């Protein structure tokens, strides 16, 4: 078996185990997202890429969504929701973003790999993705690969829940797609 195939199998199996997550927290996340006046999303590095993909889908759902750090992003205010994606939950800018959001009266949804992190403690809603430390992880899924893959899949599941809650369809989302596919 090739290393690529072995790595892919390992990643898929690991992510499936990691996503045996609590459905209650997902429902809380959906309520927070659909109730927010505006949704602001933040993450750094590969977690930031996952966050951007999530922000894109929320925009396609018709939600007023922004990525924190862009020059055209408005300020976060009370009634908004800040979604922060961070594996460690201790990235300084992620924790600061959550604390500032709370200070101005916005809600915070944290997607973290560490349920006991500073970011998780600063959040109103926590989607915790726990990773089992396996010997093969370093060889087949280095650094934060498993968290990033799992968080992307989990957030795509949240998108499906928000879609249902808002009565959206793929067709209505397509009409908001940047490329108008």
Task: For the regions a language model picked out, list residue spans one by one.
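Glycine-rich phosphate-binding loops that contact phosphosugars or nucleotide phosphates
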Residues: 38-153, 159-160
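Short, flexible segments with low predicted structural confidence
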Residues: 3-5, 29-30, 72-74, 130
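Internal, active-site/partner-interface "lid" segment
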Residues: 118-121, 135-139, 163-181
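Generic N-terminal amphipathic, Lys/Arg-enriched alpha-helix
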Residues: 1-21
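A short, well-structured juxtamembrane/interface segment
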Residues: 18-35
